[in-house]
């Protein structure tokens, strides 16, 4: 399901533990790491899609997490042409995402990367809140910057968490 501009509706999940470290998943049979994410099915709300993806990719149920916040609007990224299947190149541009910030209220042992018949990750770890900016694949970096910065205002209520010096200029949220 694509919108008129060629973007697939999607949800992204930033899952934090009690130390405000983020869940970081290693894509199966690859050397890349990312946050859980996935498409919104027809008739599904972003929140319903988020809970479905959370279970499919991480094995967590609604009782294992608390929703702390979500982005105000859609954040978009374009997928490089050479990554797009030939038959989709004239219609598909990338993803548009609503991002959710979740707190793990369960235990680390509740995480199960094999909850689905098609696992996305084969390893995971907790990382510093800003580490994903250094490690995510380049074409997703701006969306990660926008989501992390916007949701840091919710997570670190006393004042927004400062990104590392190298990312301060990059972390400004740009309105679409």
Swiss-Prot record:
NCBIfam families: PRK00714.1-2 (NF001935), PRK00714.1-4 (NF001937), PRK00714.1-5 (NF001938). This is RNA pyrophosphohydrolase. It is an enzyme of class 3 (hydrolase). It comes from Aromatoleum aromaticum (strain DSM 19018 / LMG 30748 / EbN1) (Azoarcus sp. (strain EbN1)). Coiled coil: none annotated. Pfam families: NUDIX. Accelerates the degradation of transcripts by removing pyrophosphate from the 5'-end of triphosphorylated RNA, leading to a more labile monophosphorylated state that can stimulate subsequent ribonuclease cleavage. It comes from the Bacteria. Residues 6-149 form the Nudix hydrolase domain. Its cofactor is a divalent metal cation. A motif (Nudix box) lies at residues 38-59. Keywords: Hydrolase. GO terms for molecular function: mRNA 5'-diphosphatase activity. One of its GO terms (cellular component) is cytoplasm. Its EC number is 3.6.1.-. Belongs to the Nudix hydrolase family. RppH subfamily.
